[in-house]
Each structure stands twice: as structure tokens, then as C-alpha cells.
């Protein structure tokens, strides 16, 4: 049977030491917060207070130091290499910026990632990257990122980059933001809320419907932040591709239950995260 590849996404992995911790618990993907200074430079991997219930909100690194640690964790042959870690979501905290700084934020982000993660295109980290943007008005971050990689001579690295708008906006409005950004493909759609609160699956189901329709723009759907077995099963039953969690071992446990093992498998590097799964 054709099984849906699943991404177990470790939530709020902001210190280099946490990469090992989350992957060892079963995550094949991590989510990292990126804060910006007032000139739109990515500054720290930092969430801050408040954050998810039961988590320390204040772990951090300088962004470039995190990128170097992440590169080691995703470069075959490195002593810190994890074969399993195949996707990284950068949760871009652009709320501190003016809307007209989005392009610059994308440009500066691209320069940092190119140098410290991709090693200027010379055997850098291999993980796929999702740029997750909280505000539809900041779609020019994508443009700035893309144009910078091109002007720096590495347009091919865009093959490793996907996108997400994380504001739980109306799906049609999300589609329009991608039109404005000139994006076709590589689209992950998030839906969710902090683990301190409950959220139903109605918008997830809407996103799944878009993903599975012949004219949809979404390739993958993920739900956050899921820490309990029952809510994991509900999300899998709704057909998500990814689940973001504080407890990767809980998600891995559910995926190993016979009902889910028959229909899902843990995604590997050979699973293209920009490809819509066809049953």
C-alpha cells in the first residue's frame, strides 16, 4: 500500500543542544523561532515569554551560531549528523518589523542561511527549509529571499525552500498572498494554536481539501501544537502530513499503532516535501 509520509515536527527548538534532544525522541523535522533586530537582521533563535505550557520559553542562540549547529546536524559525515533530520521550519517572528521591512528581512535571512547553513553552496546542510511567515502582508520576504539567492549566484538552492503563512488566515487570502509573491508550489499550510488551548480541525480539513483538489495550491498540511495521543489521532484522521509537537515520542508512538502504521510512514530524505501525496 502507498503510505503517506509523515513529518514529526519538534516544536521550539532554539538551542543547538535541543536538536539532538528532539531528533533522539523521534522528530524528523524541527521548528525554530527567528527574531529580528530593528534593521530586519535575523538576530536570535528565540521565542520568549509566553510560550507553550510546560516549556522553557527563553532558550536561545545567535541565529548564525544556530545555523552552524544545524548545518553540522544535517551534513553527512559530520560527527553530529542525524540522517533522520530532513526538514526545518523557520518560524519568522516578523511581527516586530514594519511591513515595508519584509523584503529586507528576506534578503538578510537569505545571506545568513547561504553563508552559515549552505556553506555558500559548498557541501552545506542538506535539510529542506520552510520559511514560515506570520503575516500575509509580509509576502515580500519571499521575494527578497529569492532575489538574493539569485544575485548571490545560487538560485538552485531555492529547490530546497518552501513556504508557510502561519496566521490561520482564510485559505483564499493565503492563496492571494502567494500569487502576489509569485509562488507556485513548495507550499506547506499550517493551522494551529498553543498547546495551552484547544482548537478544532475545521480549518485543517479545509486546507486538506484544497491540497487534495485538482486546482489547490497547498502541497502539505501541518497542525500545531499537539502533545496528546487523542489529538494526534484526530489530526492523522483528518489527513495531515505533519504534526508539530513538544513530545515527538508521543507522535511516534501513535504512528506505530497498527491503524496508523498501515497508512503512514515517517518521511525520509527521499520524500520530497514539496510533492503532494497521491494515494
Curated annotation (Swiss-Prot):
Pfam families per the record? GDPD_2
The residues that the entry says bind Mg(2+) are 31, 33, 91
Give the organism, scientific name: Loxosceles reclusa (Brown recluse spider)
The record's tissue-specificity note reads: Expressed by the venom gland.
Q: Name the SUPFAM superfamilies on file.
A: PLC-like phosphodiesterases
**Cofactor note from UniProt?**
Binds 1 Mg(2+) ion per subunit.
What positions constitute the catalytic site?
11, 47
- Note the superkingdom of the native organism: Eukaryota
One BP annotation, GO: killing of cells of another organism
> According to the UniProt record, which cysteines are disulfide-bonded?
51-57, 53-196
The protein's matches in InterPro entries, at most eight in alphabetical order, are given as:
PLC-like_Pdiesterase_TIM-brl
Q: What is the enzyme's main class?
A: lyase
Enzyme Commission designation: 4.6.1.-
Q: Which GO terms describe its cellular component?
A: extracellular region
The alphabetized UniProt keywords are: Cytolysis, Dermonecrotic toxin, Disulfide bond, Hemolysis, Lipid degradation, Lipid metabolism, Lyase, Magnesium, Metal-binding, Secreted, Toxin
**What is the name of this protein?**
Dermonecrotic toxin LrSicTox-alphaIB1
Instruction: Identify the cofactor(s).
Output: Mg(2+)
Entry GO MF terms: lyase activity; metal ion binding; phosphoric diester hydrolase activity; toxin activity
Q: Which family does it belong to?
A: Belongs to the arthropod phospholipase D family. Class II subfamily. Class IIa sub-subfamily.
What does the record give as the function of this protein? Dermonecrotic toxins cleave the phosphodiester linkage between the phosphate and headgroup of certain phospholipids (sphingolipid and lysolipid substrates), forming an alcohol (often choline) and a cyclic phosphate. This toxin acts on sphingomyelin (SM) with high activity (18.3 U/mg). It may also act on ceramide phosphoethanolamine (CPE), lysophosphatidylcholine (LPC) and lysophosphatidylethanolamine (LPE), but not on lysophosphatidylserine (LPS), and lysophosphatidylglycerol (LPG). It acts by transphosphatidylation, releasing exclusively cyclic phosphate products as second products.
